[in-house]
Amino acid sequence: MRHYEIVFIVHPDQSEQVPAMIDRYKATLAAAGGKIHRIEDWGRRQMAYMIDKLAKAHYVCMNIECDQKTLEELEHAFKFNDAVLRHLIIKTKKAETEPSIMMKEVQREEARKSAQSDAPAVAA
């Protein structure tokens, strides 16, 4: 079995259904004997360019290990799911289990926001 990194972009109006999509893809992998090494929900982010007149979308990254048939099933699911705007599948040499650079950035942003909300308001 080979290792892959998959990033897919979901329509921002369908953000609530992202966990269900991830569960469906997990079930497909589990049924075929594949392994999931890392799943990261990067959340709603600004896109580099407009797709279907949208400036923001919901990003998800998955690092998996599966055979070619299972990968084709996943790719078929991405292509025929109208909520998935784009997807990218990259073959990797080894399993990635550490947080990605994007996830570290998301965690920094969340920490900064929580620090700002926890700070007492200064009277002007």
UniProtKB/Swiss-Prot annotation:
SUPFAM superfamilies: Ribosomal protein S6 (SSF54995). It holds the Pfam family Ribosomal_S6. InterPro entries: Ribosomal_bS6, Ribosomal_bS6_sf, Ribosomal_S6_plastid/chlpt, Transl_elong_EF1B/ribsomal_bS6. The keyword Cell membrane does not apply. Keywords: Ribonucleoprotein, Ribosomal protein, RNA-binding, rRNA-binding. Residues 105-115 have a biased composition (Basic and acidic residues). Signal peptide: none annotated. One of its GO terms (molecular function) is structural constituent of ribosome. One of its GO terms (biological process) is translation. It comes from the Bacteria. Residues 101-124 are annotated as: Disordered. Gene3D superfamilies: 3.30.70.60. One of its GO terms (cellular component) is cytosolic small ribosomal subunit. Belongs to the bacterial ribosomal protein bS6 family. Binds together with bS18 to 16S ribosomal RNA. This is Small ribosomal subunit protein bS6. The gene is rpsF.
